[in-house]
């Protein structure tokens, strides 16, 4: 069995929160543009000082060339209106009092990443977990907000509130920003940071570009994996009707019928194409392609731009995993599985944007389409499991289809020199369809179910477990087969208007106000059917049919005559609707209305202040089928303020304070079961959750000691009331580990981060090769410490069944925090140490780069440890060990036949870092919930622009 590919390139998205009329569209941030040009800045004596001339960068972007940014209140001219002492402070930093990081298109290109999440892993204090979800300073994805051109994005993931950023290719993103301090013109849900992606709108000139990349993973490509046929359009990520949902599933979904599906309807299901798991000893390479074009038209003094982009990627990842668990206080294994999973991921993207500039005004209409499909084959075997009776084999075939569509209209208007108005409205729809999640359970036995011996003539030529007999379905495992249909559909309407007015004077003041609306509607369902014979009680087909492989097991002959030894038609196969714990469907709504006022001014020489107040009211409801509605209605006043002291040339001190909130996600509130294909674990919501409230403090020192070079040092502190945490639990001794949700009385998080960026010219080494080249060194380190408070306060007990009595005098479904959690433990998802290093050589006169990228994240908690089945005490927390990651990226440009070409070579995860999620029971005893090797990934790509 082969191991998992490390091709899940980490992507860290950065987003910016800025007050109206404060942020210039200029470069800066985590990895500044590699070039420099002539500018003018204010010197300490108040005189305009010309900057030295340096070559234009290899990406064709100068240090002061505007970066395209669209977000609430962003002003393209603000950087020219603000007086800051120091010639080296980037315009982005001059223009905003907030702490921001900005990735321009050139910055993103240096990382070599294909999606925005991977590029942002290089930003100070950011890490990516679980396939594209951003953690800022160790706070989970629930504390990060994702915006597209300033408008919120819905998530196509039922287990998450935020959008996985690895579905955004870098080809459609003009810039990415992260703001770590809060400003009131953004939504009140803020914990670690806000991420804003700006799509490309008006090209600088007409162009056509395209590219193609091939990649190989040394644990997946041309190695063993599991696949299944599916439909003819699977390679594009779309179902061709093979997985069409029969009407009887819709009837059950609508609450019709008895829940028993007769044989005639069972036969309507797609069979062999969705059930037959096959070995593929030579999995193909990973392929991706992209095509984009843009045109710009001059209409008098106005400009009209059109831009479009299409891309498609098809990748494979195989994981050979150890999956264990224990329900014992001492860590004695209950289950010890060896699992092989192969993920075939197909991502299709499209963008069409129109932009119109007239005078100082801009209108843009942006349409984004992202379709992300995961086709998964899974086989799992064990001899150690609860009440073991021989070698057990489970097989799964899955299809998870996610889709995101957003259409957005933005207007940015400069009504007068002093008055500016921004308006933006958007509609977004996200879907997740997972039809035909199939599972079959077989037991190896030396005798048939009716007592006949089975002869065994030796190994079958395969490695791993050997069945000394034959696999058969029996009533030993109930159900012997199951099928699940799940759907999610979410609509999101948003609108925002921002008005700012600048009062001129010796010390100008900018006053701003705005209104925000968000309306979200979600419907989610999960319908599970278990196969059984018409005898009921989960019975399996009789001999010899129970020896059949899955597609034969569900053939018409077996469906209509499941007990052949008893005579024709004596029993048939039927489906039993399985009402798992919780609801099979729910509706959810979130309506938010908010308004804010804000003032920004230079209150003294070199001292700049911004202060504001946001009022936000929201009603969040989750209504499960046949269950009571959970309703959260809260109103908040959220103050925020930041001081910036430009006390010396090229040096600044910033201090910020704010109150913010975090609401429970729909999935966290809904008592519905879902399986996460990444962690291969079941999740279950909790209707007893409530909002979290955060108090945020931050101070930061910034020294821009040379052009595009800097040293920064920051400290931060957060106090969280009712932080929501993921908790592992077991519903019984035979049940698999599940993840639930609860909140704690409180938690604190504090830490510091340091960043250094340095360029060293190499011309002194002599020769033409080094004449225009320089060394690039970018390093950052973040230390974070958090502690949860687990006292006697009553908190939701995720392991408690609905309506069950509370623990130690607490209400039903609740228990004392000290009985469920370890006081002083770290928050889930938080690493104490994050290290990023980029070391490279680049040409300042042409496109030529080679960069070594190093990333390290220390251990972090993924789930609080489950409570012991006895009800007393709890197991150790579940810990992920991310370790180190080493990547190498090389880019070389050249011209051929009138076109510009770029050749890019990448080597990812050179250390072959293993994924490791475990519990430590002491004395060297570990339980590995998920452990597998991640392969090295080598890719070669070429792109061209005409």
Where are these regions (language model features)?
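N-terminal Sec signal peptide and the immediately downstream disordered periplasmic leader
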Residues: 2-111, 119-125
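A beta-strand signature from Gram-negative outer-membrane beta-barrel systems
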Residues: 155, 167-211, 276
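Outer membrane beta-barrel strand-and-loop segments of large Gram-negative receptors
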Residues: 476, 488, 496, 542-544, ...
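Gram-negative outer-membrane beta-barrel transporters
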Residues: 605, 715-719, 738-864
């Amino acid at each position: 069995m082969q191991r998992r590919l490390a091709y899940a390139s980490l992507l860290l998205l950065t987003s910016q929160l800025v007050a109206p009329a404060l942020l210039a569209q200029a470069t800066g941030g985590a990895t500044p543009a590699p070039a420099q040009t002539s500018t003018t800045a204010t010197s300490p004596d108040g005189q305009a000082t010309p900057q030295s001339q340096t070559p234009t960068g290899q990406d064709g972007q100068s240090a002061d060339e505007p970066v395209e940014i669209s977000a609430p209140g962003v002003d393209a001219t603000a950087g020219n209106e603000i007086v800051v002492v120091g010639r080296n402070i980037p315009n982005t930093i001059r223009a905003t009092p907030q702490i921001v990081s900005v990735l321009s298109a050139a910055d993103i290109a240096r990382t070599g990443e294909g999606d925005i999440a991977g590029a942002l892993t290089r930003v100070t204090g950011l890490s990516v977990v679980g396939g594209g979800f951003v953690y800022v300073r160790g706070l989970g994805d629930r504390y990060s907000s994702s915006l597209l051109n300033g408008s919120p994005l819905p998530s196509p993931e039922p287990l998450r509130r935020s959008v996985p950023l690895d579905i955004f290719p870098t080809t459609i993103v003009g810039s990415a920003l992260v703001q770590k301090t809060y400003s009131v013109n953004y939504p009140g849900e803020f914990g670690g940071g806000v991420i804003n992606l700006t799509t490309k709108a008006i090209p600088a000139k007409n162009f056509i570009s395209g590219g193609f990349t091939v990649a190989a993973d040394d644990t997946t490509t041309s190695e063993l994996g599991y696949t299944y046929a599916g439909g003819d359009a699977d390679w594009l990520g779309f179902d061709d009707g093979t997985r069409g949902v029969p009407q009887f599933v819709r009837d059950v979904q609508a609450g019709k019928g008895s829940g028993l599906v007769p044989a005639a309807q069972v036969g309507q299901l797609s069979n062999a194409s969705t059930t037959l798991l096959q070995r593929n000893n030579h999995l193909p390479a990973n392929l991706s392609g992209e095509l984009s074009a843009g045109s710009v038209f001059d209409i008098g003094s106005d400009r009209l731009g059109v831009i479009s982009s299409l891309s498609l990627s098809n990748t494979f990842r195989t994981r050979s995993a150890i999956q264990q668990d224990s329900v014992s206080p001492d860590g004695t294994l209950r289950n010890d599985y060896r699992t092989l999973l192969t993920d075939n991921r197909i991502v299709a993207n499209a963008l069409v944007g129109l932009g119109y500039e007239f005078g100082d005004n801009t209108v843009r209409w942006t349409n984004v389409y992202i379709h992300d499909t995961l086709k998964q084959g899974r086989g799992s075997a064990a001899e150690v499991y609860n009440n073991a009776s021989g070698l057990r084999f489970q097989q799964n075939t899955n299809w998870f289809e996610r889709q995101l569509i957003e259409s957005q209209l933005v207007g940015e208007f400069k009504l007068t020199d002093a008055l500016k108005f921004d308006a933006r409205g958007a509609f977004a729809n996200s879907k997740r369809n997972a039809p035909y999640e199939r599972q079959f359970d077989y037991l190896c036995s030396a005798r048939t179910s009716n007592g006949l011996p089975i002869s065994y003539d030796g190994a079958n030529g395969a490695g791993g477990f050997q069945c000394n007999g034959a696999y058969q379905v029996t009533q030993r495992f109930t159900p012997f087969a199951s099928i699940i249909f799940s759907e999610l559909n979410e609509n999101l309407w948003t609108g925002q208007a921002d008005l700012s007015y600048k009062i001129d004077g010796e010390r100008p003041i900018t006053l701003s106000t705005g209104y925000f609306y968000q309306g979200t509607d979600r419907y989610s369902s999960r319908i599970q059917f278990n196969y059984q014979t018409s005898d009921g009680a989960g019975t399996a087909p009789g001999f010899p049919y129970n020896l059949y492989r899955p597609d034969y097991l569900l053939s018409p002959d077996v469906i209509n005559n499941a007990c052949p030894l008893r005579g024709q038609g004596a029993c048939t196969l039927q489906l039993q609707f399985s009402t798992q714990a919780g609801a099979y469907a729910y509706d959810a709504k979130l309506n938010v209305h908010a308004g804010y006022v804000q003032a920004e001014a230079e209150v003294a020489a070199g001292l700049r202040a911004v202060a504001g107040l946001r009022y936000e009211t929201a009603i969040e409801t989750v209504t499960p089928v046949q269950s009571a509605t959970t309703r959260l209605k809260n109103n908040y006043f959220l103050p925020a303020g930041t001081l910036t002291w430009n006390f010396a040339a090229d040096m600044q001190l910033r201090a910020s304070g704010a109150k913010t909130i975090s609401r429970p996600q729909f999935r966290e509130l809904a008592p519905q079961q879902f399986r996460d294909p990444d962690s291969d674990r079941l999740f279950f919501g909790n209707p007893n959750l409530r909002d979290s409230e955060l108090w945020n403090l931050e101070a930061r020192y910034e020294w821009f000691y040379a052009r595009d070079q800097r040293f920064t040092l920051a400290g931060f502190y957060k106090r969280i009331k009712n932080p929501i945490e993921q908790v592992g639990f077991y519903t019984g001794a035979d049940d698999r580990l599940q993840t639930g949700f609860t909140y704690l009385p409180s938690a604190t998080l504090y830490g510091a981060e340091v960043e250094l960026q340095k360029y060293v010219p190499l011309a002194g080494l002599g020769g033409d090769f080094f004449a225009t080249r320089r060394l690039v060194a970018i390093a950052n380190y973040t230390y974070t410490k958090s502690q949860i408070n687990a006292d006697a306060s009553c908190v939701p007990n995720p392991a408690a069944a609905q309506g069950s009595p509370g623990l130690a005098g607490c209400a039903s479904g609740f228990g004392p925090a000290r009985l469920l959690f370890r006081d002083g433990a770290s928050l889930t998802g938080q690493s104490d140490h994050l290290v990023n290093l980029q070391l490279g050589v680049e040409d300042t006169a042409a496109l030529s780069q080679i960069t070594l990228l190093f990333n390290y994240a220390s251990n972090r908690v993924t789930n609080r440890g489950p409570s012991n089945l006895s009800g007393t005490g709890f197991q150790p927390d579940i810990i992920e060990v991310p370790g180190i990651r080493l990547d190498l990226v090389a880019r070389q440009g050249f011209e051929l036949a009138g076109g510009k070409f770029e050749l890019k070579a990448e080597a990812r995860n050179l250390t072959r870092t293993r994924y490791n999620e475990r519990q430590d029971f002491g004395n060297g005893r570990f339980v590995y919930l998920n452990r597998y090797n991640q392969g090295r990934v080598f890719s070669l790509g070429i792109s061209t622009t005409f």
